[in-house]
């Protein structure tokens, strides 16, 4: 089989997630009927979105919302705008959200949405029309106790503001808790902007303390310098880590002397890509992933570490800032090489923890300061890591942390489904 064919077969995120689920199912002793129930979403909504472009021509886009599991509470997960969105990807990401919310003991199930669109090719008015039309088509399946969307790739607080306004217009329900990641004027909280990066950095610090002698002076490479990657870099830098490599879709840069995170952000704002950072060595994303470092944080897209480049990874610790950045085959190779992996369902859960704080605040009508919210996120992430670490050491020391994290998450969902008579 050719390398191209191998890459094609391992690129489907849904297939990879089902493989991981069945591996955990064997560990927990789950029967095939239960695994089948867990591997399929409860509902997938597919919509055809048509808007009139600024040129007067009709534009058509496909959109989805996957509602994977609601045993523990309403569906919760982001909505992404990307030309690469597929139904399988959205389903897989909603499954990951189920495990993530369960692991963090949040009162949510898993959901995810997406529209297949290149937002860079749309005007601001076209983006607004697209966003409003999406809510028009799926509003019957949303609600603060039903399904609560949030920002994801290429969506932001403004997108959530459009979503919320359209939802209120259609339903007549002035319920700001239906969406999270909103502007502060609409019940959003400031920390939601950087809560995912804060969570990744917190988990990286805790993992470094346990596995590689501490975060102070650790050499860190981050693939992806968008919201998650840039804030992760900022917080790790404040914690004493040394950021030696960063990249985005345009490529990356490595500097053994360390990268000035604020300067890198200025370069991105002025030139469009961190690859234009004036110091250090220019590298491709592939080269960045296999460069020498203590901590590697893939914070871009899924499946970037596969069976072909996993043998070349030089990091001692991998912290998954993105969803599903390692294929199942890469997982096995990395495990055999003794590299510790902190899985996505824990590492990047700061975003949904931030969303939970916002949602709970909206539901209660309370007021919370950014410092209080930040502390809640750090404490929740730290406690979740410590619980996983102790459980792993006590019960499943022969298993990798991803398997144990998923085992904890899946077991809680299964117990909830059994209690409700769903299994």
Curated annotation (Swiss-Prot):
Belongs to the Glu/Leu/Phe/Val dehydrogenases family. GO terms for molecular function: glutamate dehydrogenase (NAD+) activity; glutamate dehydrogenase (NADP+) activity. It comes from the Archaea. PROSITE patterns: GLFV_DEHYDROGENASE (PS00074). It is an enzyme of class 1 (oxidoreductase). It catalyses: L-glutamate + NADP(+) + H2O = 2-oxoglutarate + NH4(+) + NADPH + H(+). This is NADP-specific glutamate dehydrogenase. Homohexamer. SMART domains: ELFV_dehydrog (SM00839). Keywords: NADP, Oxidoreductase. InterPro entries: Aminoacid_DH-like_N_sf, Glu/Leu/Phe/Val/Trp_DH, Glu/Leu/Phe/Val/Trp_DH_C, Glu/Leu/Phe/Val/Trp_DH_dimer, Glu/Leu/Phe/Val_DH_AS, Glu_DH, NAD(P)-bd_dom_sf, NAD_bind_Glu_DH. GO terms for biological process: glutamate catabolic process. The active site is at residue 112. Its EC number is 1.4.1.4.
């Amino acid at each position: 089989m050719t390398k191209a064919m191998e890459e094609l077969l391992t690129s489907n995120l849904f297939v990879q997630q089902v493989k991981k689920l069945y591996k955990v199912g064997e560990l927990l002793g789950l029967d095939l009927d239960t695994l089948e129930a867990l591997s399929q979403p409860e509902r997938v909504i597919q919509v055809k979105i048509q808007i009139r472009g600024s040129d007067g021509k009709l534009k058509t886009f496909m959109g989805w919302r996957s509602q994977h599991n609601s045993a523990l509470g309403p569906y919760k997960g982001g909505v992404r705008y990307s030309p690469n969105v597929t139904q399988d990807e959205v389903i897989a990401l909603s499954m990951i959200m189920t495990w993530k919310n369960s692991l963090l003991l949040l009162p949510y199930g898993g959901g995810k949405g997406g529209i297949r669109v290149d937002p860079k090719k749309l005007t601001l008015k076209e983006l607004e029309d697209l966003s409003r039309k999406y809510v028009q088509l799926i509003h019957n399946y949303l609600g603060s106790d039903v399904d609560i969307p949030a920002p994801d790739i290429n969506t932001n607080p403004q997108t959530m503001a459009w979503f919320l306004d359209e939802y209120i217009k259609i339903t007549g329900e002035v319920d700001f808790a239906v969406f999270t990641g909103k502007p502060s004027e609409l019940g959003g909280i400031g920390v939601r902007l950087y809560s995912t990066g804060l969570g990744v950095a917190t988990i990286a610090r805790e993992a470094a303390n346990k596995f590689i002698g501490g975060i102070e002076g650790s050499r860190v490479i981050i693939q992806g310098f968008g919201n998650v990657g840039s804030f992760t870099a900022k917080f790790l830098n404040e914690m004493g880590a040394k950021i030696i490599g960063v990249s985005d879709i345009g490529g990356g840069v490595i500097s053994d002397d360390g990268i000035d995170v604020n300067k890198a952000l200025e370069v991105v704002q002025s030139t469009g890509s961190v690859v234009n950072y004036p110091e250090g060595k220019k590298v491709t994303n592939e080269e960045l992933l296999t460069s020498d470092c203590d901590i590697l944080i893939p914070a871009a897209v899924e499946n970037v570490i596969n069976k072909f480049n996993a043998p070349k990874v030089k990091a001692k610790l991998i912290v998954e800032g993105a969803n599903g950045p390692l294929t199942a085959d890469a997982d096995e190779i990395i495990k055999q090489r003794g590299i510790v992996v902190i899985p996505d369902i824990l590492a990047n859960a700061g975003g949904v923890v931030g969303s939970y704080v916002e949602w709970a605040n909206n539901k209660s009508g309370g007021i919370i300061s950014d410092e209080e919210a930040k502390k809640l996120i750090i404490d929740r992430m730290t406690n979740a890591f410590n619980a996983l670490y102790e459980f792993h050491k006590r019960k499943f020391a022969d298993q990798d942390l991803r398997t144990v994290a998923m085992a904890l998450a899946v077991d809680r969902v299964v117990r909830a489904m059994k209690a409700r008579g769903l299994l």
